[in-house]
């Protein structure tokens, strides 16, 4: 049926900030949906709270609201805009939950708004565990034995009947939040309590564990005419028991017989039809490896992480087509945008193998529990494509950017068989590497299968890789062996180490022997029809399908998988850079490996290469395309780290030169440059040994800030207050030597300022200056940023502008630069300069209207700032106040300390904007998930060094009617200041104590600052973790606390007795 003409305006709900379980895939799907609806002539209104996305660019929709995704704000937008319909199925779990809340509140009915795509009843049937189970029973579809529970007693009675292990699945949550596998009563109490707390409807499904079955996913589409197709089916290498977002996944499925494939396909189509879903849907199934028994695990009635993967794996743009189906078009009316000949009702066919490996944040959080279960922990993922599974897997391994080029990790070589067995059974992020190590050490496939029930097919593939390693080592210099190894995806890096040569020597050896990969096209139809997509992957085969044009081209390096410190902000900059290259008349080529992002949508660039970002893989593309040069400054540290090797290969780095990049990153060169420019910086030195570090710290004086050089996201950065902490850091956090020095700076407790600027070598243009609420010492990515600065004098602002211009010119920056300053005792010091795009680029671009990545790209391509209508100086400040607030995923990562410091911990960000700082802060805090009640109780436990400062804060909480709770030490200080306080027992007390208050939800805020000595077993750590587990806002920085107080005070009417007012006035008269 043709598209609907009875609706004109559609509100699309975004997915909000990036958190574990909901990452950049919704920027991709949301952007596609908005463009798709606009193509059909609808007016599109978008609401999302995340400024770091392409989706929230003003060009994506007709009207863009960057506001909190809460009932209060979304209702206000609906009442103001009066859309005809809302489309919530492209905004992840956030979008679905928002639609349910809007419907229940009555606002949709009040404003006559209908829900498109998937009916409310279908959302509830798929998301409500009880309704879903009933539907499956009606369809005669098997589900594991299960029970819906609302409290612990119901959980006990189910377990007594069915036995352990059981899986807990909370209703209406994201990424398995709050869920898990329980093997005993202790785990049952902990996980059920957590699950009920995280479910917005206080409901969990308890089901008998079917861990060990194969986990299969079907990505299906259906339209209003009941046409339904399977876009892609995927198989998890990890059996059931590990969340699919934490599983290694391959597409298409590799181990199903035709009968099994058709059986599960029919089930998936039957379910999507029964739910009446119009659009995309993801069905997760479990299959017993020894029979045809299967179970339906769950259904996501929306576009999901898996649909982003399926879209990139097949080239079939699910979100784009789901949006068209939502407005009434049918699959047999929509042309497949890939072939531009066939229709969307043709099921895609693949003649290659796709592998997805999750990217976990454990390199950032060494104390985190690495065990994988039903609650997701990965922040992002990589995808790779090969002609066989071995090639595909090894390409994915080297895409992870953990400095790994092969399926082996040195530290696993020491493991004995018993340890390997335990870790393979338990499943952690290194399981596949441990399986390979076990095979190297002679453990049989049968034993490994017994331990973890991984299919023999996958174990055989790992064994093939291990056997090939032996071949490579036994045949040094043999070209036939080299050819076979390359066909299996072995890297030059691995072969060089095995043959005792350099990577460059292997590369040259291959070129001399014409041993180079070809590029194949991703075309949705296994080459059955001609395809129009410029979307390629490399493989060692005969025919090359990537045709080089005679146009001048520029290569942009993407930023790889989403991880803490390098988020979707860099993808935003990459996409804008690609658009600018096209505007400037060049062919834009992008290399990236993240299936979740907008940059890997083949319609963005002229050519997309889905490849690992290693020197070998990038050089293959450059050798073929022979571009004018490569842009590295938008791909975060990933791309910057490739610059030197690319230049060694004779590749031109466009923009800031390698020498100047190095001058900003190398400590001694940077110091020399600052001295020459007369710009002050905190006293600091470089240490290459532990002894040197101790001597430097003594000379500078504690506290000192220590960090390795060349890092992103403050990795392994710490403030240390005394010598034993420094020794602990040097021993545990870094491996210091001449090539990897450690930087040691005096730690200045001052106001931190962040500046983004664009330089063309002559002119330096500054779109914005941001002030951080938390003082220096908290990583800029974890600070609340405010634009324009609220407390800087004009004199200090001028100093900052002068220093920025001097640095842009003095460091010969061509393109973007990001500078962090600290204001200490009314003097501006430079902390660091990053000669690249920073994570604040999208935020400032949206606020100021200056498309920073676009302008910087054109500068890099030779169009100076004046030609583009900008000059030297500071862009006029906006009237409104904008706040960038960090969002954390601590609830997903057990045993991680939530204290803020110089190492970045946030996964995403939101924006709040309004006419006053207080209102903007309120929006930013609410959007980031912090509840701001106007009354209640606050627990205060602070370190001795913070007691004095905490008194003023406590007094202000008391003034607005909050009840103060504190342990004996802090309580005594409060009583001495005549501030009423209730004493609570410390956490080691047998009686009712501080943790009980948090668990029972009797505190609205916990203020807890760090006591020195960082062992996680400490009291403070337990208080902070208990707060996170129970959803209580835990404030570890007094600066953040003050910001929240400002908001609370602005929301509270003053309530003083007349006597207090007259006393104050008399006091003022006396002192006048």
Swiss-Prot record:
Residues 133-327, 671-861 form the ATP-grasp domain. It catalyses: hydrogencarbonate + L-glutamine + 2 ATP + H2O = carbamoyl phosphate + L-glutamate + 2 ADP + phosphate + 2 H(+). Mn(2+) 2 binds at residues 298, 300. Residues 547-929 are annotated as: Carbamoyl phosphate synthetic domain. This is Carbamoyl phosphate synthase large chain. Keywords: Amino-acid biosynthesis, Arginine biosynthesis, ATP-binding, Ligase, Magnesium, Manganese, Metal-binding, Nucleotide-binding, Pyrimidine biosynthesis, Repeat. Its cofactor is Mg(2+); Mn(2+). Mg(2+) 1 binds at residues 284, 298. One of its GO terms (cellular component) is cytoplasm. The gene is carB. GO terms for biological process: 'de novo' UMP biosynthetic process; glutamine metabolic process; L-arginine biosynthetic process. Mn(2+) 4 binds at residues 832, 834. Residues 930-1072 are annotated as: Allosteric domain. Large subunit of the glutamine-dependent carbamoyl phosphate synthetase (CPSase). CPSase catalyzes the formation of carbamoyl phosphate from the ammonia moiety of glutamine, carbonate, and phosphate donated by ATP, constituting the first step of 2 biosynthetic pathways, one leading to arginine and/or urea and the other to pyrimidine nucleotides. ATP 2 binds at residues 707, 746, 752, 777-780, 820, 832. Binds 4 Mg(2+) or Mn(2+) ions per subunit. Composed of two chains; the small (or glutamine) chain promotes the hydrolysis of glutamine to ammonia, which is used by the large (or ammonia) chain to synthesize carbamoyl phosphate. Tetramer of heterodimers (alpha,beta)4. Mn(2+) 1 binds at residues 284, 298. Pfam families: CPSase_L_D2, CPSase_L_D3, MGS. Mg(2+) 3 binds at residues 820, 832. SUPFAM superfamilies: Carbamoyl phosphate synthetase, large subunit connection domain, Glutathione synthetase ATP-binding domain-like, Methylglyoxal synthase-like, PreATP-grasp domain. Residues 1-401 are annotated as: Carboxyphosphate synthetic domain.
């Amino acid at each position: 049926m043709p598209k609907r003409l009875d609706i004109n305006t559609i509100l699309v709900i975004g997915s909000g900030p990036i958190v574990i379980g909901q990452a950049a895939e919704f920027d991709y799907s949301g952007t596609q949906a908005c463009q798709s609806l606009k193509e059909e002539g609808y007016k599109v209104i978008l609401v999302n709270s995340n400024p770091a996305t392409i989706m929230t660019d003003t060009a994506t929709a007709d009207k863009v609201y960057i506001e909190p995704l809460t009932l209060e704000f979304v209702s206000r937008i609906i009442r103001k805009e009066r859309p005809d319909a809302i489309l919530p199925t492209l905004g992840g779990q956030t979008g679905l939950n928002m639609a349910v809340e809007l419907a229940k509140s009555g606002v949709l009915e009040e404003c006559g708004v209908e829900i498109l795509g998937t009916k409310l009843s279908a959302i509830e049937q798929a998301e409500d565990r009880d309704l879903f189970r009933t539907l499956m029973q009606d369809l005669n579809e098997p589900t594991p034995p299960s029970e819906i529970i609302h409290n612990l007693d119901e959980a006990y009675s189910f377990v007594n009947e069915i036995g352990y292990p059981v899986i807990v699945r909370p209703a209406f949550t994201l990424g398995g939040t709050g869920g898990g596998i329980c093997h005993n009563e202790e785990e049952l109490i902990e996980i059920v309590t957590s699950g009920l707390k995280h479910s917005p409807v206080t409901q969990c499904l308890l089901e008998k564990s079917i861990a060990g079955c194969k986990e299969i996913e079907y990505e299906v589409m259906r339209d209003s005419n009941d046409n339904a197709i399977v876009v892609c089916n995927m198989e998890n290498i990890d059996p059931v028991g590990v969340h699919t977002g934490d599983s290694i996944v391959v597409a298409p499925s590799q181990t199903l017989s035709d009968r099994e494939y058709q059986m599960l396909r029919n089930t998936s189509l039957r379910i999507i039809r029964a739910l009446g879903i119009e659009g995309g849907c993801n069905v997760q199934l479990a299959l017993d490896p020894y029979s045809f028994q299967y179970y339906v695990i769950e259904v996501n009635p929306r576009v999901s992480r898996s649909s982003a993967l399926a879209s990139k794996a097949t080239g079939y743009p699910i979100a784009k087509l789901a949006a068209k189906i939502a407005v009434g078009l049918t699959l047999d009316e929509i042309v497949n945008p890939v072939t531009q000949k066939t229709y969307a009702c043709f099921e895609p066919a693949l003649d290659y193998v796709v592998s997805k490996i999750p990217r976990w944040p454990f390199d950032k959080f060494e104390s985190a529990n690495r065990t994988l279960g039903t609650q997701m922990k990965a922040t992002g993922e990589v995808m790779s494509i090969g002609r066989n599974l071995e090639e595909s897997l090894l390409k994915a391994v080297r895409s992870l950017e953990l400095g790994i080029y092969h399926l082996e990790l040195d530290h696993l070589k020491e493991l004995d068989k018993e340890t390997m067995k335990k870790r393979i059974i338990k499943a952690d992020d290194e399981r596949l590497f441990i399986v390979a190590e076990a095979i190297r050490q002679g453990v049989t496939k049968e034993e490994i299968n017994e331990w973890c029930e991984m299919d023999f097919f996958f174990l055989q593939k790992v064994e093939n890789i291990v056997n090939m390693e032996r071949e490579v080592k036994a045949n040094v210099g043999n070209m036939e062996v080299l050819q076979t190894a390359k066909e299996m995806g072995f890297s030059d890096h691995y072969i060089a180490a095995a043959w005792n040569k350099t990577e460059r020597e292997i590369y040259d050896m291959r070129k001399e022997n014409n041993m180079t990969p070809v590029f194949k096209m991703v075309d949705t139809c296994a080459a059955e029809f001609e395809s129009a997509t410029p979307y390629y992957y490399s493989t060692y085969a005969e025919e090359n399908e990537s045709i080089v044009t005679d146009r001048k081209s520029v290569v942009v390096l993407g930023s790889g998988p989403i991880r803490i410190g390098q988020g979707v902000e860099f993808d935003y900059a990459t996409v804008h850079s690609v658009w600018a290259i096209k505007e400037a008349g060049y062919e834009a080529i992008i290399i990236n490996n993240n299936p979740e992002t907008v940059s890997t949508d083949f319609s963005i660039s002229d050519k997309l290469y889905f490849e690992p970002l290693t020197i070998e893989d990038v050089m293959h593309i450059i050798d073929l395309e022979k571009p004018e040069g490569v842009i590295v400054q938008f791909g975060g540290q990933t791309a910057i780290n490739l610059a030197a090797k690319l230049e060694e290969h004779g590749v031109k780095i466009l923009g800031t030169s390698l020498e100047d990049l190095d001058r900003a990153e190398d400590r001694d060169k940077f110091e020399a440059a600052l001295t020459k420019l007369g710009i002050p910086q905190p006293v600091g030195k470089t240490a290459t040994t532990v002894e040197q570090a101790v001597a430097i710290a003594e000379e500078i004086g504690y506290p000192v800030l220590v960090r390795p050089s060349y890092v992103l996201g403050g990795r392994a950065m710490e403030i240390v207050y005394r010598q034993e902490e420094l020794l602990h850091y040097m021993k545990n956090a870094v491996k210091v030597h001449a090539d990897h020095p450690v930087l040691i700076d005096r730690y200045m407790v001052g106001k931190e300022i962040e500046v983004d600027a664009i330089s063309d070598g002559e002119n330096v243009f500054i779109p914005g200056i941001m002030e951080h609420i938390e003082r220096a010492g908290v990583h800029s990515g974890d600070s609340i940023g405010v634009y324009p600065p609220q407390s800087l004098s004009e004199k200090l602002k001028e100093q900052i502008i002068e220093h920025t211009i001097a640095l842009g010119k003095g460091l010969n920056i061509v393109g973007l630069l990001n500078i962090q300053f600290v204001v200490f005792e009314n003097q501006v010091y430079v902390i660091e300069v990053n000669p690249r795009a920073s994570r604040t680029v999208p935020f400032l671009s949206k606020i100021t209207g200056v498309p920073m990545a676009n302008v910087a790209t054109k500068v890099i391509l030779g169009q100076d700032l004046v030609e583009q209508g900008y000059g030297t100086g500071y862009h006029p400040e906006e009237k409104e106040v904008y706040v960038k607030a960090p969002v954390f995923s601590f609830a997903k990562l057990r045993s991680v300390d939530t204290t803020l410091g110089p190492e970045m911990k946030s996964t995403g960000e939101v924006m709040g904007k309004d006419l006053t700082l207080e209102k903007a802060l309120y929006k930013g805090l609410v959007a980031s998930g912090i509840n701001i009640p106007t009354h209640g109780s606050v627990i205060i436990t602070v370190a001795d060094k913070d007691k004095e400062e905490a008194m003023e804060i406590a007094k202000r909480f008391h003034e607005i009617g909050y009840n103060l709770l504190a342990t004996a030490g802090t309580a005594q200080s409060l009583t001495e200041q005549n501030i009423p306080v209730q004493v609570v027992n410390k956490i080691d007390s047998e009686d009712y104590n501080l943790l009980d208050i948090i668990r029972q939800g009797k505190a609205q805020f916990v203020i807890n600052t760090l006591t020195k000595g960082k062992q996680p077993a400490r009291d403070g750590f337990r208080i902070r973790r208990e707060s996170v587990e129970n959803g209580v806002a835990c404030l570890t920085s007094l600066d953040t606390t003050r910001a929240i107080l400002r908001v609370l005070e602005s929301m509270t009417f003053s309530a003083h007795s007349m006597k207090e007012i007259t006393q104050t006035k008399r006091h003022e008269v006396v002192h006048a």
